[in-house]
Amino acid sequence: MDQAEFGHLVEKKSASSELFKGRLLHAFRDEVILPSGKVATREYVVHPGAVMVVPLLEDAHGHLQVVLERQFRYPVGRVMIEFPAGKLDPGEDCFACAQRELREETGFSASQWAHAGVLHPLISYSTEFIDIWFARGLRAGQRKLDDGEFLDVFTATPAELLDWCRAGVVTDGKTLTAALWLQNVISGAWALDWHEGV
């Protein structure tokens, strides 16, 4: 979408103050000038960005499976089903982060990768983006979880994942988005441009 043609909707920052600076997140309160000329306040969180990987695996019978994780998420107080994901380290590019997160969290490395797109999960109050990658040609290896990271890795069929999405078992926004991508890739409606991995 060409942003230039929607200039009549753009808000302009006139002042900014930092409310909180943590190890991961920074919170700001900005004063903005609205398209009408009036002034409003916007509070938001600055996030370094993240990646999510949709790892594709074939079982012994050649049937497609996806690699998923179960992880406790403190803010919602629940164990969630998710695709492997993680935040960007300073100066790290998205593809390198995708490779690292897949290897660290699941132990898998992949011989082929495809970039699907970018997700902005919290547009009303965060700068966070999530780069979406598909991986195939998986090779098993050793996991290397971050200190304080606890998660289970398991596989499911795409049909099982879609059933869980429909039933409300999967409620994580990025995983729901990935399930939409997966469904369209499998059906042939959306194509991926695969490249050899490192």
Locate the predicted segments by residue:
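Short helix-capping/linker segments at secondary-structure and domain boundaries
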Residues: 182-195
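Acidic, metal-coordinating catalytic segment for phosphate/diphosphate chemistry
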Residues: 15-54
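Conserved Nudix-box catalytic region and its N-terminal flanking loop in Nudix hydrolases
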Residues: 2-3, 7-11, 42-45, 54, ...
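Unchanged
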Residues: 40, 49-52, 86-173, 193-197
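Residue-level detector of beta-propeller blades
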Residues: 13-14, 115
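Short beta-strand micro-motifs in enzyme catalytic cores
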Residues: 26-30, 65, 129-131, 152
